Amino acid sequence: MASRIKKGDQVIVIAGKDKGKQGEIIRIDGHRVVVSNVNFVKRHTKPNPQRGISGGLIDREAPIHVSNIKILNPMTGKGDRVGFKILGDGCKLRIFRSTGEVIGA
């Protein structure tokens, strides 16, 4: 089954504390995604001299639920829904619902 979102897609956050922010999908974990420069949390880390890690507070991105993002349509500059189009040879393409343009082409 084809996925509605993929790693590297440009998305916009539609709900939560970071509503309106845009970023790129870094990682997908089931129904949660990590988006660059969105949903920063502070992590307390111990120093580890073997790995060269200094201790303290580290800001990093935390995952958000996939229902809180929409894929960014570059033609309109807004979030858009994703649809699928099946070609004659059986290929399944992702398309923007509002414009019908193929995503990533």
Swiss-Prot record:
The reply to whether Oxidoreductase figures as a keyword in the UniProt entry is: no
One of the protein's GO biological processes: translation
Q: Does the keyword rRNA-binding apply?
A: yes
**Could you state a single Gene Ontology molecular function term?**
structural constituent of ribosome
Q: Which GO terms describe its cellular component?
A: ribonucleoprotein complex; ribosome
Q: Which residues form a coiled coil?
A: none
Q: Which Pfam families match?
A: KOW, ribosomal_L24
- Read off the CDD domains from this record: KOW_RPL26 (cd06089)
What keywords does the record list, in alphabetical order? Answer: Ribonucleoprotein, Ribosomal protein, RNA-binding, rRNA-binding
Kindly indicate where the leader peptide sits in this chain.
Answer: none
Q: InterPro entries in the record, alphabetically?
A: KOW, Rib_uL2_dom2, Ribosomal_uL24, Ribosomal_uL24_CS, Ribosomal_uL24_KOW, Translation_prot_SH3-like_sf
Instruction: Describe its assembly.
Output: Part of the 50S ribosomal subunit.
What family does this chain come from, according to its entry?
Answer: Belongs to the universal ribosomal protein uL24 family.
| Role, per record | One of two assembly initiator proteins, it binds directly to the 5'-end of the 23S rRNA, where it nucleates assembly of the 50S subunit.
Q: What protein is this chain from?
A: Large ribosomal subunit protein uL24
